[in-house]
Regions:
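Conserved C-terminal alpha-helix-loop-beta "cap" of PLP-dependent enzymes
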Residues: 130-202
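Conserved PLP-enzyme active-site core in the AAT-like
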Residues: 1-127, 132, 138
C-alpha cells in the first residue's frame, strides 16, 4: 500500500506486464510487511525499511532488499550489488536488529489487530469524514497471506476546518512523529510534514 492513503497497486497484473515486456519489477513491502503479504512471488526485488515495522522502535536507520531466486535477472542483480560500495551497518546495529527479529511476528499480529479495531471505530464516528485502510482493497487481498493481516497504518480525514483539526491533533496524548510500525501508537500530520512548502499553492 501507498503512504499515507493506502492505495494498493495490482501487483499481479503489473508482474504479468513486466514479464511480457522484459522489465524487472521492484516493489517495497514496508507498509504491508512480508508477514502479511506475498509480494516476492510477483517481484524480482523487494525492498523493506528495517527502520519501521522490523525494528518496532524507529530508532535505527537500516533497510534490506530481497532478490527473488527465481528471477531471470538474479545473476545480473548479484553482479551489480557486488560492484557497488554499500555502506555496512555497525555491529551494534546488527545485534539490535537480530534482537528485533525475535518477536516481530508477535508484534505484527498485534499491530494488524489494533489497527483494524481502530479503523472500525473511526469509520463509524460522527467526526470522521474518511478512513483510508487496505481492508477492502481487492489488490491487497489478492496477495494477502493465509494468516496475514492489513498492517499497522491507517489515515483519516476529519470533518470541519483546519482549526478543528489542529485542536484535535494537539489534544491527542500520543507520541507524534514521522514514522510507522513502532510498538507504541504514533500519529503524524502527514500533509503538513510532507508537503509543507506546497500547502499555500495547493489551497
Amino acid at each position: 500500500p501507498s503512504n499515507p492513503l493506502l492505495k494498493c497497486t495490482n501487483v499481479i497484473e503489473i508482474s504479468k506486464i513486466a514479464q511480457r515486456y522484459n522489465i524487472p519489477l521492484i516493489t517495497d513491502d514496508t507498509i504491508g510487511s512480508n508477514l502479511n503479504i506475498n509480494s516476492l512471488d510477483y517481484s524480482d526485488i523487494v525492498f523493506t525499511s528495517l527502520t519501521k515495522i522490523f525494528s518496532g522502535s524507529g530508532d535505527i536507520l537500516a533497510g534490506s532488499l530481497i532478490l527473488n531466486p527465481r528471477s531471470k535477472w538474479i545473476d545480473k542483480f548479484k553482479k551489480a550489488l557486488n560492484e557497488i560500495d554499500i555502506p555496512k551497518l555497525s555491529d551494534n546495529d546488527l545485534v539490535y536488529l537480530e534482537k528485533c527479529s525475535r518477536d516481530i511476528e508477535f508484534r505484527v499480529i498485534n499491530q494488524n489487530s489494533n489497527c483494524l479495531k481502530l479503523k472500525k471505530k473511526l469509520e463509524n464516528h460522527h467526526a470522521i469524514k474518511t478512513v483510508f485502510h487496505p481492508e477492502n482493497c481487492p489488490n491487497f487481498n489478492s496477495i494477502l497471506k493465509r494468516n496475514g493481516g492489513y498492517g499497522c497504518l491507517l489515515s483519516f480525514e476529519l470533518k470541519g476546518n483546519i482549526q478543528k483539526t489542529k485542536k484535535f491533533y494537539n489534544a491527542l496524548e500520543l507520541s507524534k512523529g514521522p514514522s510507522l510500525g513502532t510498538q507504541f501508537s504514533l500519529i503524524c500530520p502527514y500533509v503538513l510534514l510532507a508537503h509543507y512548502n506546497e500547502l499555500e499553492w495547493a489551497n
